[in-house]
Every structure is written in structure tokens, then in C-alpha cells.
Regions:
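Secretory targeting and sorting signals
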Residues: 2-39
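Compact beta-sheet-dominated domain cores in extracellular/mature segments
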Residues: 40-332
Length: 332
């Protein structure tokens, strides 16, 4: 697959729970093309290979250099070099001490393909995983899953506590097509990121901010191009938080209002002054984009399907939450 090399690295499938009806129509309309793509890729011995059986040996995790920086990859075997990803909504499993399900499982979804075996194949292991070059052994771990292979008990590799996956559109070890991709197939919804080996944090690359017209208003938005999508990518409005320094949104809050992340300085797009953009380091070490000193957030119910009239909207403006009030940023 040919990669789009732009200054933007937020790549997503655009959809949210608020637009599930429209989303389902759009996905089902594209289902034949999507299903045939999965079937064709499943037979190729590449990073697209689905999980079909329990592992027979120990998995190795290594690192590689990409446009997003140094990230985790499969370290040995036929899948050596394939990009590895985490999904942010798996944090809910940790925050609820295992009561909440993992976001990516083999359960039903609108696309009709199992998330953790076909779309985002889980990295499985038999025994403790092996730390390759650049990987911190103390951050490697495993967890037991019974929702990956139709009830069979298997061990999935984790890094800094979060499960690791491949992406079925990464046809070769050079590809990172799943980076920064919002996934409506998972439940709860979340964003897929490459993984920084230093702390196990997301490795988002450099984010672009631009002025976009949403629901008749020009607002500051995060540009989210996606070179893999059933539909074209677009932009999502961003929000500031009304509390003293705008940084009160952590843990549960961040699952509903994901921080806008970047690796390095964000890029100013159309209608945005570069000097107004900055970064602040969050408690987990990730770099959050700021505008005029205020940290920026997304809202999980703001997704839309480009080209489908009436689906693009601003749903979080003025939302009063336990952490403060969220507001968009009007631009002229």
C-alpha cells in the first residue's frame, strides 16, 4: 500500500457512537470491497496474516525506525518487522481492574470481521515474550485472553500493561497504516497508535492543526488524514477545558475527551498561526498540543463520515463535566 507522506499523522476511520446508524449504512455499503480485501490479504505471508491458531513459541518484540520515531515491532519469525500498535480504550480495562472488556475482541461488529484476529491481529505468545534490541524487558508482559480465538485460552503480549496488535492493512514491515486511526469497530471506541519503546506511550508523529468549517462555524480542528479508510478522512474540532490550567482531564475523562497528542512541535495548517501552537507534557509523558497555552482535546461523539450530509457536527461545545466545561475555539 502506498503511504501518503504529509505533515499530518492523525490517521483514522471516522466514526463515533453518536453516528452509529449512519456509520453502519456506510460500512455495509462498502462491505464487499472490505471483505474481499481481508480475504486476499489473509492468504499472503505478510504483516496482514490473521491469527488462526494458538502460538507454538515465544514471541519477540523489537524496535524499528519510522517517520513516527522509534516504535515497537515484531522481532522474529515470518512477521519480523511488522508494526505493533496499542489502542487507547484498552485503558478502561485497567481502570476497572479487569471488569471492562478489552476494546478489540472477536465479538460482532459493523464490519463483520473479527477485530483481534483479522483486522488487528493480536500478538500472541507461548511463554514469556523475548525483549529484542531497544525493548525494555520490565515493560513486557502477558495477559490471558479467552475472547481472541473463540473461547480458547491464549496469552497476548503486553507492553506497559497494554495489549499489542498488528494491523491488517500493513502489507510489509515498512508500513504503519494503522497509526493514529480512530476505530469504530472496537468497543469502547479508541485510537490506535504505534508504541514508543521508552515508556510504552503512544507515538503519534507530528500533528497538524487547521481552521475548518464545522456546522457552519469556523473552529480549530485536528487534521486527521488517513491513507486507509473506507471513506475519505477529515478534520475533528478540538476543545479547551475551563479549569485553571486545562489539564484536569486524565484517566476516565481522557477516554471521553482524548488529548490531542503529537511527537514534537505541532504543525500549523490553513488559518492557524504557528506561534499559537505549543505542547505540554502530560503526567504519563505524552505531549499534548496546546493553543495559546491551553491544552486541546477531542470529543468521542464528534466523528462524522465525509461526504454524508449532516453527519459532521460539534457535539461537545459547552459540555459541563466533573472536570470542567469544554468549549471549541472559534476562528475567523
Amino acid at each position: 500500500m502506498k503511504l501518503l507522506h504529509t505533515g499530518t499523522h492523525f490517521r483514522r476511520l471516522v466514526a463515533r457512537p453518536a453516528t452509529v446508524a449512519v456509520l453502519t449504512v456506510g460500512l455495509l455499503a462498502a462491505a464487499p470491497q472490505f471483505s474481499s480485501s481481508v480475504s486476499a490479504k489473509a492468504s499472503a505471508p505478510s504483516c496482514t496474516t490473521p491469527v488462526t491458531s494458538a502460538p507454538t513459541g515465544r514471541a519477540t518484540v523489537s524496535t524499528k525506525s519510522t517517520e513516527f520515531g522509534t516504535v515497537l515491532s515484531v522481532g522474529s519469525g515470518a512477521l519480523s518487522g511488522c508494526s505493533l500498535y496499542l489502542i487507547t480504550s484498552d485503558e478502561l480495562h485497567s481502570l476497572t481492574f479487569g471488569l471492562a472488556a478489552f476494546a478489540c475482541s472477536d465479538g460482532p461488529n459493523p464490519i463483520g470481521q473479527p477485530c483481534d484476529t483479522v483486522l488487528w491481529p493480536a500478538l500472541l505468545t507461548k511463554g514469556a515474550p523475548i525483549a529484542g534490541p531497544g525493548v525494555k524487558r520490565n515493560l513486557l508482559g502477558t495477559l490471558t485472553r479467552t475472547d481472541v480465538l473463540s473461547g480458547e485460552s491464549v496469552q497476548q503480549v503486553t507492553y506497559a500493561g497494554l495489549p499489542l496488535y498488528r494491523f491488517f492493512q500493513d502489507e510489509s514491515a515498512e508500513e504503519t497504516d494503522g497509526a493514529n486511526l480512530f476505530d469504530p469497530v472496537t468497543s469502547p471506541s479508541g485510537t490506535w497508535y504505534l508504541v514508543d519503546p521508552g515508556r510504552g506511550n503512544p507515538a503519534p508523529g507530528r500533528l497538524q492543526m487547521a481552521s475548518e468549517k464545522v456546522s457552519g462555524s469556523k473552529v480549530l480542528a485536528a487534521t486527521m488524514d488517513n491513507d486507509f479508510s473506507l471513506l475519505p478522512g477529515g478534520s475533528f474540532p478540538v476543545y479547551t477545558l475551563s479549569n485553571k490550567n486545562g489539564q484536569a482531564c486524565q484517566t476516565y475523562c481522557a477516554l471521553l475527551w482524548p488529548p490531542v497528542l503529537t511527537s514534537g512541535q505541532p504543525e500549523a495548517g490553513n488559518g492557524v498561526a504557528q506561534h499559537a501552537l505549543g505542547v505540554v507534557v502530560r503526567p504519563d509523558g505524552t505531549r499534548q498540543v496546546t493553543y495559546k497555552g491551553k491544552p486541546l482535546y477531542l470529543f468521542i461523539e464528534d466523528a462524522y463520515i465525509p461526504g454524508v450530509t449532516g453527519t459532521q457536527s460539534i457535539n461537545g461545545a459547552g459540555a459541563v463535566t466533573p472536570w470542567g466545561t469544554f468549549n471549541t475555539i472559534p476562528l475567523s
